[in-house]
Amino acid sequence: MDGKPLNEAQCAVIDRHFDRFGRSEHSRLRIDEKQSSVYNPCTARLHVHKHDRRLSGKQELVFDSAAGRATSLTSHTLKLWDRRRHASAREYARIQGFPESFVLPRQLVANLFGNAVAVPCALHACRSVVGSDGAAPGTLLDLCAGIGGFHLAAQMAFPRIRCVGFCDVKPAAVQCYKENFPDVPALGDITAVQEWPRADLLTAGFPCQPFSRACDIKVRAVHKDRLFYEHVFDAIDAARPNYVVLENVRSLACPTGKPQLDAILNAFRDRGYHTNHRILDAADFGLPQQRFRIYIVARLDGSVEVPPAPSCARTTLGDILEDAEDAVHTDPQF
C-alpha cells in the first residue's frame, strides 16, 4: 500500500474526537471493503454489516485493510471530525488538492472545502477537453464556482488564462474567491445575470442536490422541476465558449439521474458541441479521499474524450494530517 499510515498520535486524535459519533451510522469506520467490516471507535470492536447500497451511500471514513489506517475522507465525515478536532486549513487544502497558501476564512472551512471541486480531477478534465490538438483557451467563465477549484485547475492547465467572471450565491464562498482572485468580477446569482461575458472555457460545478445520495427524498422533490443546469446553458448560449467542463455527483450517471444526464448531453449536441463524460475518483489522483464525481466535457471544434485517471501513488491521511499539537491555525486566513 502506498502512503504513510497514521501515527499513534493521529489515531488517538481521530478516536478521541469520533467517540461522540460512535453510535451514529455516519461515523462508522469501514476497515475491510471486501468483508464490509466496520470499526466503531466507541466500542473498539469490529462489527460486520451487510454491505449494500444503503450502507455504501453513507458518509464514512474509509480504512485500508492492509495498513489498518484511514485512507480517505468524505466531506460529511470531514465536517463531523472538524467539530471536535478543528483541522487546520493546510490539512483541508491537502485533502482537496488546493495549494497550502490558499487564503481561507476563519469560519466554515470544513463546509467550503467539503463542497469544493477536487483540483487534480478538475485539472485532468480541463486538459482533456482541450486535448493535444486544441488551442489553449485565453479566457475563463467560472460558474457555480465555490471557492475557486476550477479556476485553480484552469490556471495550472493554461497559465495565461484570464477569468472574466465567476458566479456563486454563498457569501462565504464569494468572499473566499475574491480574497484569492481579487481581480475577477463577481457576477452574482447565476439565475439573475442579465449579460454574460464571452469566454473560451466555461466551467461549472452546478448544484448536485437533486442527484446526491445524501439528499433526502423531500429535497429531491423540491429540486425536481428546477432544472438548474438550464441556467448554465443560458450562460453557454451567451458566452459561446469553445470548451465546457461540468462537474456533478456520480449519481447523475445512475438510473435515477440518467434522464437529466441525457438531457444535458442532448442540450450540448443541439448547440453543436461534441461531448464525453467520465466518473473520476479523487483517490486516483493522489488525494487521501474517495470522492467520485462525474465530469462532462464539451467542445465545439472537434471530438473530445476524458482519458482514465493516470496511475498515481495512493495517499493516506497519515501523509497529510498533522499531529494535534502541530495543527494550529497559522494558515493564511481572513
Residue ranges and their predicted role:
Residues 99, 118-119, 206-207, 241, ...:
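Proline-centered helix-kink/hinge sites
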Residues 55-58, 187-190, 279-282:
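Short alpha-helical segments and helix-capping/turn motifs at coil-helix boundaries
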Residues 1, 168, 227-299:
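Conserved Class I SAM-dependent methyltransferase catalytic core
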Residues 133-243, 250-262:
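Core alpha/beta nucleotide-donor-binding catalytic domains of modification enzymes
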Residues 109-113, 220, 252, 284:
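Conserved short-loop catalytic and cofactor-binding motifs
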Residues 78, 100, 191, 282-285:
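Residues that form or immediately flank small-molecule/cofactor binding pockets and catalytic motifs
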Residues 1-164, 169, 174-178, 267-271, ...:
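S-adenosyl-L-methionine-dependent DNA methyltransferase catalytic core
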Residues 116, 195-199, 286-290:
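Short, solvent-exposed polar/charged micro-motifs at secondary-structure junctions
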